[in-house]
C-alpha cells in the first residue's frame, strides 16, 4: 500500500497556502486595476529567509526589461545561518516568471501614463513561492481621503446592520 494518498487536513492546506509578506501600503497609495500571480526566481538562502517571514515589499516595484519582468527594491534579509560567502545581496534585482502574453499585456498597459507595477504580496502555493503583482494608478491625497471616508461609511453601515 502507498503512503500519504489521503486527504490533507485543513491545517496542512492552510500551511501550504500561507501569506509570507504583504504590501498593505500599496493598496492605500495605489488604485489597483488588475492583478497577476507570478513565480519568482530566488536563491536558496532567499527562500529560507522568505519562508521565515524576512521580506519587505514596501518600496518594491516591477519593470519590464528585455522582455522579462524584474522585481526591484524588495528587501529579503540575509539568512542568519548562512556564511557571508553564500548569502545573497538583500536588494538584488529578482526575475519574475510569467507567460509571454501576460508580459506583453502588462507592457501595453504600462505605456499609459501614470500606471506602475507593484508587488502586493508574497505567498506559498504548495511548495512554490509566488508574488502577486498589481497594475496600479497612483492616488492623490484627496483620492486617499475619499477612499478612507468610503471605507469608514461602509464599516459604520455594516456595524449598524449587525446591531439590529
From Swiss-Prot:
Gene3D superfamilies: 2.40.280.10. It is found in: Cytoplasm. It holds the Pfam family SmpB. One of its GO terms (molecular function) is RNA binding. Keywords: Cytoplasm, RNA-binding. One of its GO terms (biological process) is trans-translation. It comes from the Bacteria. PROSITE patterns: SSRP. Its main location: cytoplasm. The keyword Repeat does not apply. This is SsrA-binding protein. It comes from Synechococcus sp. (strain CC9311). The lineage of its organism: Bacteria, Bacillati, Cyanobacteriota, Cyanophyceae, Synechococcales.
